[in-house]
UniProtKB/Swiss-Prot annotation:
Keywords: Acetylation, Cell cycle, Cell division, Cytoplasm, Differentiation, Immunity, Innate immunity, Mitosis, Nucleus, Oogenesis, Phosphoprotein, RNA-binding, Spermatogenesis, Ubl conjugation. This is YTH domain-containing family protein 2. Residues 337-349 have a biased composition (Low complexity). Residues 385-579 are annotated as: Interaction with m6A-containing mRNAs. Residues 410-544 form the YTH domain. Residues 1-45, 247-387 are annotated as: Disordered. The lineage of its organism: Eukaryota, Metazoa, Chordata, Craniata, Vertebrata. The keyword Secreted does not apply.
Length: 579
């Protein structure tokens, strides 16, 4: 019998086993030739549930019986390695391909093992641990399709305390929380995240997790969870516990003379701004630490400009200073050395007057009201007044009461001096000299006024904390003349001035006045030759003119006279050596 006759005798309807298949033959080809490629063969009596049905798979038996349980399959990882595993493969059933994953791409199912064609999932558990009973509880199939990567990963039992937890399952409000080892996971997660005993459901989700799922949290738990025995919550510490601990005793520092560091603070920092030592020129006198204790009758020095040289003054100068201190009232009892040193340490970086003027200032730069104050309008008169000072007072009317501070025309500048030595010599010789830039600015201002108004200069020593006087510029700058009287040889040029006020006015009296042309800074925070606007200058001049001062540089005039004589003798010795 030929093949064609067999085809003719074949009953109708058997040409294609697929219901929707073609019924027409084309070009002598039979549709049966394409059956292996078009669709799998339909098996009769297939009573298995669909793949999406994840509720009743445990009620059906496998289609093929095996002599061993797949749950007893040997582990291929060689130990309890805490690493994620892909979900299980489907069991071999009637020639079906065994490599098809049952829940790889978003199929719902509990514990990442949705059964394939009604078969039990491969659960990676050793014998005796069977989770088939879990298929009946409400937790099975609770993973919704909204989960971005549902049932993608599962974890080894060793890393989760014996329970295989779906990588995307949410721990809150599910019966999976009842699984063995969940306390360990919660405690480990709490120790990892918060360091407390809160449950993992209270931990905020990590930014970047997949569509509101707990996969990242589960991954962290699987790789970092620790047994409860190793979790040690931090011991709470209260302020009472901290206060009850004894303080560590600091070793007492001792000076070169063996005096305890608690009674003698360290001396002030010595900068390279000493008078007569500019650019390492002139003698550099170092004051021994004993000088602070021996000079009890002298107020302490806090200025880095005067500590080195004024501590080594000759005895006549020291005697003269004592006379200035005790002139207005009987001499007070000598102060202890420790009190004198404490006064110095209170202002280690502030300038303090070298003699009697130190008692006129408080620690905050405000004038004090203690004993030994001079009368308003003049400095304290020494027991033996210096003849140069007497001559200056007879010629000049310092601190006039009828000063006209309400200027209609005029310009006012701030002058910052490196030392009071130069202030003393400016008063003595009625001259002044600024930097090259400052001289040009002052000279231009003086020439611009052309006699229409005064040019006032407000003097202040760097770091002194007060203004020491006001002078009027009386001539243009002579750039070709060098006065040769300044404590430093760096100044070139000179111009004449007339001193009007010689008094110490603390910065606290003027700090509220701010300059709009200097970043709105206080007038006390100005640089050399900083111009003060006229309206603000009127306020400054009014305060200086009306301030009842208690100290001035006249109190130390004899001291600075002696210093000038010493400097001149040193210069003569240098000139003699140079010849």
């Amino acid at each position: 019998m030929s093949a064609s006759s067999l085809l003719e005798q074949r009953p109708k309807g058997q040409g294609n086993k697929v219901q929707n298949g073609s019924v027409h033959q084309k070009d002598g080809l039979n549709d049966d030739d394409f059956e292996p490629y078009l669709s799998p063969q339909a098996r009769p009596n297939n009573a298995y549930t669909a793949m999406s049905d994840s509720y009743l798979p445990s009620y059906y038996s496998p289609s093929i019986g095996f002599s061993y349980s797949l749950g007893e399959a040997a582990w291929s990882t060689g130990g309890d390695t805490a690493m994620p595993y892909l979900t299980s493969y489907g069991q071999l059933s009637n020639g079906e391909p065994h490599f098809l994953p049952d829940a790889m791409f978003g199929q719902p199912g509990a514990l990442g093992s949705t059964p394939f064609l009604g078969q039990h999932g491969f659960n990676f558990f050793p014998s005796g641990i069977d989770f088939s009973a879990w298929g009946n509880n409400s937790s099975q199939g609770q993973s919704t399709q909204s989960s971005g990567y549902s049932s993608n990963y599962a974890y080894a039992p060793s890393s989760l305390g014996g329970a295989m937890i779906d990588g995307q399952s949410a721990f809150a409000n599910e019966t999976l929380n009842k699984a063995p080892g969940m306390n360990t996971i919660d405690q480990g997660m709490a120790a990892l995240k918060l360091g407390s005993t809160e449950v993992a459901s209270n931990v905020p989700k990590v930014v970047g997790s997949a569509v509101g799922s707990g996969s990242i949290t589960s991954n962290i738990v699987a790789s970092n969870s620790l047994p409860p025995a190793t979790i040690a919550p931090p011991k709470p510490a209260s302020w009472a516990d901290i206060a009850s601990k004894p303080a560590k005793q600091q070793p007492k520092l001792k000076t070169k003379n063996g005096i305890a560091g608690s009674s003698l603070p360290p001396p002030p920092i010595k900068h390279n701004m000493d008078i007569g030592t500019w650019d390492n020129k002139g003698p550099v006198a170092k004051a021994p630490s004993q000088a602070l204790v021996q000079n009890i009758g002298q107020p302490t020095q806090g200025s880095p400009q005067h500590v080195g040289q004024q501590a080594n003054n000759s005895p006549p100068v020291a005697q003269a200073s004592v006379g200035q201190q005790t002139q207005p009232l009987p001499p007070p009892p000598p102060q202890p050395a420790q009190l004198s040193v404490q006064q110095q340490a209170a202002q280690p970086t502030r300038w303090v007057a070298p003699r009697n003027r130190g008692s006129g200032f408080g620690h905050n730069g405000v004038d004090g009201n203690g004993v030994g104050q001079s009368q308003a309008g003049s400095g304290s008169t020494p027991s033996e007044p210096h003849p140069v000072l007497e001559k200056l007072r007879s010629i000049n009317n310092y601190n006039p009461k009828d000063f006209d501070w309400n200027l209609k025309h005029g310009r006012v500048f701030i002058i910052k001096s490196y030392s009071e030595d130069d202030i003393h010599r400016s008063i003595k010789y009625n001259i002044w000299c600024s930097t090259e830039h400052g001289n040009k600015r002052l000279d231009a201002a003086y020439r611009s006024m052309n006699g229409k108004g005064p040019v006032y200069l407000l003097f202040s020593v760097n770091g002194s904390g007060h203004f020491c006087g006001v002078a009027e510029m009386k001539s243009a700058v002579d750039y070709n003349t060098c006065a040769g009287v300044w404590s430093q040889d760096k100044w070139k040029g000179r111009f004449d001035v007339r001193w009007i006020f010689v008094k110490d006015v603390p910065n606290s009296q003027l700090r509220h006045i701010r300059l709009e042309n200097n970043e709105n800074k206080p007038v006390t925070n100005s640089r050399d030759t900083q111009e003060v606007p006229l309206e603000k200058a009127k306020q400054v001049l009014k305060i200086i003119a009306s301030y009842k001062h208690t100290t001035s540089i006249f109190d130390d005039f004899s001291h600075y006279e002696k210093r000038q004589e010493e400097e001149e003798s040193v210069k003569k010795e240098r000139q003699g050596r140079g010849k």
